[in-house]
């Protein structure tokens, strides 16, 4: 019965969002309440469960997400992201544009959320394509693979950040393992897959794209952009801070001496929220004050960045409410009991649930957060599971098979002037391979970590 309730809840969510076209956040709250009631939860506890799920999720991610999106906006508005992309392209040269693009997208993607990175990088690709006299499609798949790996695997992106907290995983470890697993994944799904796509959809690689669909975009001159070194450091500072502290924790056993002021300061600086705040303040100087911009101008950019994610924050909160209802209603525990005797690898379980929800719901973030509600009870049966790898497996599963119920599918189709079939055989194929290959690399990592 609980399984039927979950499936019915997902079906209701699809009906509300796709057929009736109700707002996704409102739909998630309605479905959360419906699933709670159908599961037999005491009516007096339904609203409390929804509120605690929403508040608990946003309470953690709100600061990280807010600081992160402001940092990304400052980097983009100063031309830092464009500098990173162009430097990588110049370094690799015309013959290895796909390698340059995938590396640039991954670096930029750490600081910028998927849709923002896409809108920022596409005009740069079109300009390079014109100069190189090639179709921008030659760089499409590599760019998307770099952005998607960062989006699905790495904090401070919303999915990995929220599920790391829900599972109790160390965010720094998720970052380190995510980079280790992510690099071979985006290489396979970027430059390597790109060659295959050229053979199966050759006509797509003759198209000039649809740059007009992006509207007005700004392209910085050479003198307007900051240097590569400072741009790279600004984008990567959150990663550096969290990774360094995590490595210190891993290599130094905590003793009585470690509990002193120095050790506590290190832990404080490595906290994901503090690391993002420090990085934001650093960006305000390197991408703003140090380049002659005023505080009002910088705060205007930050304000616009926050305004742009208000809807997304609510959707993430709605996903958190759904997750909490699955836990509080006992549905997650029921599924855990059901599969506990099957000896299923929890990494495979997390990936499979996230993949199923992603295909049904379209949103990678909502799929990842909802997965936690079903997987958390299972972790009690497998207490020695590497929680960072469970987080990555959930993220990898949430990346699979982006198709017609995902807004990104239509954005990519429109930007590059593709047919639906061509989009399925490029973007959808890439996201599916990325999810599966990511899972394989995570399973390999679990053998040694």
UniProtKB/Swiss-Prot annotation:
Subcellular location: Cell inner membrane
Listed GO CC annotations: plasma membrane
Keyword Cell inner membrane: yes
Gene Ontology MF terms: gluconate transmembrane transporter activity
One GO biological process term: gluconate transmembrane transport
Membrane topology value: Multi-pass membrane protein
Keyword set, alphabetical order: Cell inner membrane, Cell membrane, Membrane, Transmembrane, Transmembrane helix, Transport
Transmembrane domains' residue ranges: 2-22, 24-44, 52-72, 106-126, 134-154, 173-193, 228-248, 265-285, 302-322, 337-357, 361-381, 429-449
Primary site of residence: membrane
Similarity section: Belongs to the GntP permease family.
Name of this protein: Uncharacterized permease YjhF
Annotated organism of origin: Escherichia coli (strain K12)
